[in-house]
Amino acid sequence: MSGLTHFDAQGAAHMVDVSDKEVTDRVAIARGAVRMAPETLAMIEGGRAKKGDVLAVARLAGIMGAKKTADLIPLCHPLPITKVALELVPDADLPGVRIEATVKTSGQTGVEMEALTAVSVAALTIYDMVKAVDKAMQLTDIRLAFKDGGKSGRFEAE
């Protein structure tokens, strides 16, 4: 476990000490999708979901999710997030909704988990809001697409 920073020499989990790390600007972009029946997508696009505006609520839920990441994932540091933006794009070819979250901070550790949490919570919210008509929806392809800043530098998924 020598390469895993969240474990000590005995293998016990611990929160990484970032106090000696330099404060730098950091950004992370995560992506994912919710696949659904074409009829479900049409209902969302037409604003006919009984629970309300699915995409607007999912966007807000994603923002809230990013802000609550340290409360949800035990070893994540609470961070001063400076930006959370979500794009939710209906895609008839999927069919479903594509989700992208961008999170920024200026701090001692990155915001990858916050971006991934934002996408995940937005996807879960879409599922929750229309599950009554489509229980077969799939939350899929949730992944880190890009990160920059900090000691490890830049990462771009292929």
Swiss-Prot record:
The keyword Amino-acid biosynthesis does not apply. InterPro entries: MoaC (IPR023045), MoaC_bact/euk (IPR047594), MoaC_sf (IPR036522), MoCo_biosynth_MoaA/MoaC (IPR050105), Mopterin_CF_biosynth-C_dom (IPR002820). It holds the Pfam family MoaC. CDD domains: MoaC_PE (cd01420). It catalyses: (8S)-3',8-cyclo-7,8-dihydroguanosine 5'-triphosphate = cyclic pyranopterin phosphate + diphosphate. GO terms for biological process: Mo-molybdopterin cofactor biosynthetic process. GO terms for molecular function: cyclic pyranopterin monophosphate synthase activity. It comes from Dinoroseobacter shibae (strain DSM 16493 / NCIMB 14021 / DFL 12). Substrate binds at L75, C76, H77, M113, E114. The keyword Protein biosynthesis does not apply. It comes from the Bacteria. Homohexamer; trimer of dimers. Its EC number is 4.6.1.17. This is Cyclic pyranopterin monophosphate synthase.
